[in-house]
């Protein structure tokens, strides 16, 4: 039975890898063609042509983003991802995630407020935890109005280390708070925002596999606070 399970696991890993390859290859080719066209149109094209091209590039980026998320979810759900926990600098992992969101925040004139210790080391997989933190930051920036603020803090408790991301957005109704970590779940009020509702689901899966958990506190009209708790 153990050998059969290992064989099935190997076959599933190979299947997902093949699907990933088949999906990524045409998207990579498309991106290369679009980059080439972009250079040519910027030199000789008209404003409408450039506008159409940017719309196509934006769509390609969204498809690639979704593809990567679906592949990650498939691997996580089937236990095909090996979480490599080591004692690492948590603040470095946080800074790396912040670096990926700064441009988006600057466009909306969102300011960050920090409440961080001088240093904090904790057992975690830096790559996967970084993705989980990025998802929380991305949501905070996405749902905070222009000119608002996002508060980021790290605190140490008796059993856990807490990473909290608080926004000044619309908030989440109490009746919806239990559902937001489900796959593809999105509140009716936020359907005008980009995304398909898998970021929080992926965040919870990543954190759970590292022995932690995720919580949310929110008030409609006042914003939301998401916390990642990791064992010390």
Predicted regions and their residues:
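Short helix-loop "hinge" at the ATP-lid/N-box region of the Bergerat-fold HATPase_c
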Residues: 140-141
């Amino acid at each position: 039975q153990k050998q059969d399970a290992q064989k099935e696991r190997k076959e599933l890993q190979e299947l997902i890898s093949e699907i990933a390859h088949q999906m990524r290859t045409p998207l990579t080719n498309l991106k290369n063609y679009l980059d080439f066209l972009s250079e040519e149109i910027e030199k000789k094209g008209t404003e409408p042509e450039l506008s159409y091209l940017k719309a196509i590039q934006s769509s390609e980026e969204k498809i690639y983003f979704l593809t990567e998320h679906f592949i990650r979810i498939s691997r996580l759900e089937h236990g095909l991802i090996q979480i490599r926990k080591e004692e690492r600098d948590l603040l470095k992992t946080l800074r790396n995630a912040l670096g990926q969101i700064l441009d988006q925040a600057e466009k909306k004139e969102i300011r960050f407020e920090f409440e961080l210790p001088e240093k904090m080391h904790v057992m975690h997989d830096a790559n996967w935890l970084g993705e989980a933190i990025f998802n929380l930051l991305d949501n905070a920036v996405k749902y905070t109005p222009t000119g608002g603020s996002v508060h980021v803090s790290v605190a140490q408790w008796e059993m856990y280390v807490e990473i909290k991301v608080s926004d000044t957005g619309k908030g989440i109704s109490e009746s919806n708070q239990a559902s937001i970590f489900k796959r593809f779940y999105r509140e009716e009020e936020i359907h005008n925002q980009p995304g398909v509702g898998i970021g929080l689901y992926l965040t919870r899966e990543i954190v759970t596999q590292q022995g932690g958990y995720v919580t949310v506190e929110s008030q409609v009209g006042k914003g939301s606070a998401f916390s990642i708790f990791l064992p010390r």
